[in-house]
């Protein structure tokens, strides 16, 4: 553990940010899995609604720097192919 006051504060902030980022990533992954599950069950109406939600979460994660912008675009593209197939 750090001894200097500013280093202690930075370590605390880092841990808080890590937990927050993990939460956002988890929500994003859950949204993607929901879309994939709905597509496999041939529930296309609900899959389209879930796709909108997942798309927003992917974009937000990319904007915040949690995932790369191209990774978000790739995941959205693959999900869109599944939903529209």
UniProtKB/Swiss-Prot annotation:
GO terms for biological process: translation. Belongs to the bacterial ribosomal protein bS20 family. Transmembrane segments: none annotated. Binds directly to 16S ribosomal RNA. One of its GO terms (molecular function) is structural constituent of ribosome. Keywords: Ribonucleoprotein, Ribosomal protein, RNA-binding, rRNA-binding. Residues 1-25 are annotated as: Disordered. It comes from the Bacteria. GO terms for cellular component: cytosol; small ribosomal subunit. Pfam families: Ribosomal_S20p. This is Small ribosomal subunit protein bS20. InterPro entries: Ribosomal_bS20 (IPR002583), Ribosomal_bS20_sf (IPR036510).
């Amino acid at each position: 553990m750090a001894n200097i006051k500013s280093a202690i504060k930075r370590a605390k902030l880092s841990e808080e940010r890590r937990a927050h980022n993990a939460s956002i990533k988890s929500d994003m992954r859950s949204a993607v899995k929901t879309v994939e599950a709905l597509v496999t069950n041939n529930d296309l109406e609900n899959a389209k609604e879930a796709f909108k939600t997942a798309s927003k979460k992917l974009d937000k994660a990319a904007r915040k720097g949690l995932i790369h912008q191209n990774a978000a675009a790739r995941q959205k593209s693959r999900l869109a192919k599944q939903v529209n197939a």
